[in-house]
């Protein structure tokens, strides 16, 4: 279970060194301890994520000096403002992040820690920042995206110092096809999560060539804030999402047709339920089940042993059991006939 603890929409964990980060609703250290212990008894590992350098409006709203120079005075509305980033050229950013990583790493037993790295709007931030441009000149860089190298050298050094193995969201040198390279050279010990659906095959091949382990979470199969049928859009963050039906979730091929010999670097699969699109716990379980059952089978079963017709028959008793237990689920009427 990976907990996405920070984003533009809020900061969800108490940090003693920076008490202004957390709003009115957050996990205390005791909450985290209880959650980790509860999960451990059920053989579940809880992995923390602090997303940087983008997705940081909730941080920058409280500590604006951590933004790029031209963004420090800009209005920052938590949950509405986007596209702001931590400044790559400000040494205080790395001091702050070291403190945050130290505290978060100390709360979780998992050897893994996710540090984000996705959807960084570099042209609107680092490319226009005097401090970032100064760092580019010092490093002899020609492209602002190269600043991801020293940025994550600092961030990942802290992760390793506090005993964790880093995970990052997988980004290529283009958001849409065609793309032919990483956004920046990922260190060898980084585990990558492939999430951009159309870019997944390219990323899968590049990571195999370069020796990176990957976790498969392509949005069109694995994003559970996406509606399950036409018109089932969320109450929040409705940006016209594509539809991920139960069948589409089940049809995930983690290896994208590659021979098994080229799939050894795939660690597993991940389903993502983004909380800004979820109003309460009932909506969370409704969006998760039964699609999470489909993901589990997709992750554990080779394609030649998979059968949608068989799954349809086997999933209904599990849906019924959840309903009997009082769990809010989406009843898949299209397969219940």
Regions found by a protein language model. Give the residues of each.
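Substrate-binding groove of N-acetylhexosamine-processing glycoside hydrolases
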Residues: 34, 43, 91-112, 119, ...
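Substrate-binding cleft of carbohydrate-active enzyme catalytic domains
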Residues: 1-168
